Amino acid sequence: MKRSKSYRAAAEKIDFEELYAPLDAVKLARETSTVKYDATVEVAFRLGVDPRKADQMVRGTVNLPHGTGKTARVLVFAVGDRAAQAEAAGADIVGGDELIDEVAKGRLDFDAAVATPDLMGKVGRLGKVLGPRGLMPNPKTGTVTMDVAKAVSEIKGGKIEFRTDKHANLHFVIGKASFDDTQLVENYSAALDEVLRLKPSSSKGRYLKKATITTTMGPGVPVDPTLTRNLTGEATAV
């Protein structure tokens, strides 16, 4: 793949043989952003798990302390009082049977979906539409619940879902290039802490193999996955 001149110039500033401390990595990622708009900052983790095995699938949610820089559009499958509560909490799309039919026909103008348990029998039929996109409500991630207001508020506040892909990678949006370094490091640390907490007991050998921070269209900066940074800037082993 041929890279642009600006990408190649940015990549020259990175030593790809070095593992950078998180604070240095976010500074370098912001410095080497190659787009003129407010780039998205992401982190990718390569895990030492076999995602083909159910007991090694790493899946969960994390509340980023500074959000992602984007307000998620939230759809809620609910009726009656729960629908009203979802709307009051800021849900963008709320409905029951008619909404389920719309989604079945391809409506996908949302970033997260929540459902009340009583509708999951019908929502479950949307698995082929929502599942591949990571949008299927799931009780393990708090998106199948009667407390729809809380779920909507958390998602709007920066709660994100994650799961390993078929190559054992995890991807997180941790903010925007306009965030300051401390905000990005704190979001990175929150994501890292949750990934470490969810290590499967059946995973053998090295669990966290690789971490990379990158911006939209920018080169990836390798991060030392054994370090995090506290607010004093001290390196702390994890």
Curated annotation (Swiss-Prot):
Disulfide bond positions: none
Gene Ontology MF terms in the entry: rRNA binding; structural constituent of ribosome; tRNA binding
GO cellular component: large ribosomal subunit
Parts forming coiled coils: none
GO process terms (BP): regulation of translation; translation
CDD domains found in the cross-reference section: Ribosomal_L1
SUPFAM superfamilies: Ribosomal protein L1 (SSF56808)
A family per Pfam: Ribosomal_L1
Keyword Chloroplast: no
UniProtKB keywords: Repressor, Ribonucleoprotein, Ribosomal protein, RNA-binding, rRNA-binding, Translation regulation, tRNA-binding
Ribonucleoprotein found in the keyword field: yes
Family the entry assigns: Belongs to the universal ribosomal protein uL1 family.
Subunit structure: Part of the 50S ribosomal subunit.
Purpose of the protein: Binds directly to 23S rRNA. The L1 stalk is quite mobile in the ribosome, and is involved in E site tRNA release. Protein L1 is also a translational repressor protein, it controls the translation of the L11 operon by binding to its mRNA.
Name assigned to this protein: Large ribosomal subunit protein uL1
